[in-house]
Amino acid sequence: MANLKALFLRMKSVKSIQKTTKVMQMISAAKLRQVQQRLNNARMHMLELSKIIDTNVVSKNNECTDRHNKKDILLVIMSSDRGLCGNFNNMIVKFAKSYIEELESCGKNVKLLFFGKVAYNMMCSQYSSKILDVFSNIQSITDFLSFKLFLYGSGVDFNQFIDVMVLFNKFYTTILQKPTVEQLMPCNIDISVSLKEYYKYEPAYLNVLSTMSLSYILNLMYIAFLENCASEHSSRVIAMESANNNTKEMLSKLVLQYNRSRQAAITTDLIEVISGFESLGNQ
């Protein structure tokens, strides 16, 4: 009976875990659809912004920042605030360490800025002297405006770095995401013809270009953030689906074991009852 009770309690525990993983899978799937919609909208906005900048930039390979007297490279590493998303964060950390080693082998000084505390927790002991800050609670970012407010509130001056890179998991499909590095600053914008002479600017041209360049950089980072969020939710959907399948398999084995144990207990009881009747009959 003790064995039956232990099996029953274990089955109850597995059923509870199964419900939890199923709910988490459904929530992540819903969040993934929302992020995909936001990502598509951000890409469309970025396309139109790129057209405007291409029309108004002065020359080819225009650099939006002054690179003099700047030595450090800023690497923005995007991960998640939570686990239970498969190897999503492990891929980011492994790729980040490899990329940092590559930059340092070229004699460059790298500073780190983290979006999401999981990668930070995995790397803080090794790169403590390089870390500027870590931003957690990133799930509170719901649109471009909240992303800008979140970024402005950080107090990080991106203009103090010679290069700014963002490292994130790029979303391709639900089952395919790859760690990627993209350059944010300086923003090199290539065009074939300068059309500045065909337009009048109010305020001054450089002010307009500076504002558009800042918007361009923020949009690049926002798209990287959304790509990373989509990859996170996709990884969590797959991880929870796998966990749910594992609980189903475990539960079926436990049910089979429970039924066998119960049948054995019933058989034992019947044998004892029959043996008792037989002993009484013999008397």
Swiss-Prot record:
Keyword Transport: yes
Localization, UniProt: Cell inner membrane
Record carries keyword Cell membrane: yes
Gene Ontology cellular component terms for the protein in this record: plasma membrane; proton-transporting ATP synthase complex
GO BP terms in the entry: proton motive force-driven plasma membrane ATP synthesis
Membrane topology annotation: Peripheral membrane protein
Predominant cellular place of this UniProt entry's protein: membrane
Transmembrane region(s): none
Superkingdom of origin: Bacteria
One Gene Ontology MF term: proton-transporting ATP synthase activity, rotational mechanism
Keywords, alphabetical: ATP synthesis, Cell inner membrane, Cell membrane, CF(1), Hydrogen ion transport, Ion transport, Membrane, Transport
Family annotation (InterPro entries): ATP_synth_F1_ATPase_gsu, ATP_synth_F1_gsu
Role description: Produces ATP from ADP in the presence of a proton gradient across the membrane. The gamma chain is believed to be important in regulating ATPase activity and the flow of protons through the CF(0) complex.
Family: Belongs to the ATPase gamma chain family.
Known partners and oligomeric status: F-type ATPases have 2 components, CF(1) - the catalytic core - and CF(0) - the membrane proton channel. CF(1) has five subunits: alpha(3), beta(3), gamma(1), delta(1), epsilon(1). CF(0) has three main subunits: a, b and c.
Name of protein: ATP synthase gamma chain
Source organism (scientific name): Ehrlichia ruminantium (strain Gardel)
Biological classification of the source: Bacteria, Pseudomonadati, Pseudomonadota, Alphaproteobacteria, Rickettsiales
Gene expressing this chain: atpG
